[in-house]
Regions:
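Catalytic centers of nucleases
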Residues: 20-111, 126
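SF2 helicase/translocase NTPase motor core
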Residues: 1-19, 39-54, 104-111, 120-290
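Structural motif
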Residues: 73-75, 115, 227
C-alpha cells in the first residue's frame, strides 16, 4: 500500500523542482476533499489561482482557500513542501499572515478570513515560529506529516507525463468484532431499563471503536440524530478519538472541541490546541452558538 511519504518521494523524483509547490498544492486540495475530518468541515477547497474571490491577484502567501460549512466562512491555507530536515522559522510565515489578514471582495461586500491553516512536510519548528501560532486574532492551526500520514486514505498518485495525476479514495470502514457486538447489544439492553450505565472493556479490545458503533445505533433509533458528550483528560486523546471516529463513522459527524483550560496545551505530555484538526473553544458563548 502506497504511503503519503512514498507519494512525496515520487513527487520529488518525477517533477522538476520548479513544479514542486504546484504539485503539492494539487495533492493537498485532493487531501482536503477526501480526508474524513477535513471533508466534514469544508465543502469547497480550491487553489488560490482558482478562487473566485482572489481579485485577480497573484498568490503572495495564500496557496489554498477552503469554505467552512459550519459558519459560511473562508479559511486561508498555506502549503509548505519542504524537506523533512528544513527548520521552519517565523519569517517563513510572515507573508502568509500578512496576506490572510487582508479583506477580500465578494458579491455580498468585503469579507475577512476567519481561520488559517498551515500544512508542512517538515515538523521542525523554531520556538518563535511555534509561538507565532498562539493568540492570533485569526485562529491558526497546523497540519503536519503525522496527521496526513495517518489519514484513512488510499494514496493513488501517478506521474504519466509532466503533470501529477491524483485519484485519492477513503479506506473501507470496519465491522465490529464478535466481542464488540456483544458489548453493544448488552449496553443497548441496559439502556432499555436504565438511563445511565458503565461499559467496561479491557485494554486493546477497541473501546473507542465500540463507542462509535454504539453511538451510531443510538442515533439510528432516534431518527438519525444523537448528541454525544465525549470527555477526555487531554487534548492528545481528544485528537486521537476524533480521528478514529471520523475515519470510521457511517453517519455525518458535526464535531467541535471544548477546552476547559486555555493553558492545558503547555503540559509536556499533551499537544497544542493549534494541532487539533477541528476548531477549539474555551468560550461559552461560542459553544452555545453551535
Amino acid at each position: 500500500m502506497t504511503s503519503f511519504k512514498d507519494v512525496l518521494d515520487q513527487l520529488r523524483e518525477n517533477q522538476p523542482q520548479g513544479k514542486y509547490g504546484i504539485a503539492f498544492e494539487k495533492l493537498m486540495v485532493n487531501f482536503f476533499r477526501t480526508d474524513p475530518v477535513q471533508k466534514s468541515q469544508f465543502d469547497e477547497v480550491v487553489r488560490w489561482s482558482d478562487w473566485r474571490y482572489n481579485g485577480g491577484k497573484a498568490d503572495t502567501g495564500i496557496d489554498l482557500v477552503a469554505h467552512r460549512i459550519e459558519d459560511d466562512s473562508w479559511t486561508a491555507i498555506q502549503c509548505k513542501f519542504y524537506k523533512p530536515s528544513t527548520y521552519i522559522a517565523k519569517n517563513h510565515l510572515d507573508s502568509f499572515f500578512e496576506a490572510s489578514g487582508r479583506s477580500f471582495e465578494t458579491e455580498n461586500g468585503p469579507m475577512h478570513f476567519k481561520n488559517r491553516m498551515i500544512i508542512s512536510t517538515s515538523d521542525n519548528w523554531s520556538s518563535t515560529a511555534e509561538a507565532a501560532l498562539e493568540n492570533q486574532l485569526i485562529p491558526t492551526s497546523r497540519i503536519g506529516m503525522a496527521e496526513i500520514s495517518e489519514s484513512p486514505i488510499n494514496w493513488d498518485v501517478a506521474f504519466p507525463g509532466s503533470e501529477i495525476q491524483i485519484n485519492l479514495s477513503p479506506r473501507e470502514t470496519f465491522e465490529p468484532r464478535p466481542h464488540q457486538e456483544e458489548a453493544i447489544a448488552r449496553t443497548l439492553e441496559g439502556f432499555a431499563t436504565h438511563d445511565r450505565g458503565k461499559l467496561i472493556m479491557a485494554c486493546g479490545t477497541g473501546k473507542t471503536f465500540t463507542a462509535l458503533r454504539l453511538a451510531e445505533r443510538v442515533a439510528e433509533a432516534n431518527g438519525g440524530k444523537a448528541r454525544v458528550l465525549f470527555l477526555v483528560p487531554s487534548i492528545s486523546l481528544l485528537s486521537q478519538t476524533l480521528k478514529e471516529w471520523t475515519a470510521q463513522s457511517r453517519v455525518d459527524l458535526h464535531s467541535f472541541a471544548v477546552c476547559s483550560d486555555s493553558k492545558v496545551s503547555k503540559k509536556a505530555e499533551d499537544i497544542a490546541t493549534h494541532d487539533l484538526s477541528v476548531k477549539v473553544s474555551t468560550q461559552g458563548a461560542d459553544i452555545a452558538e453551535r
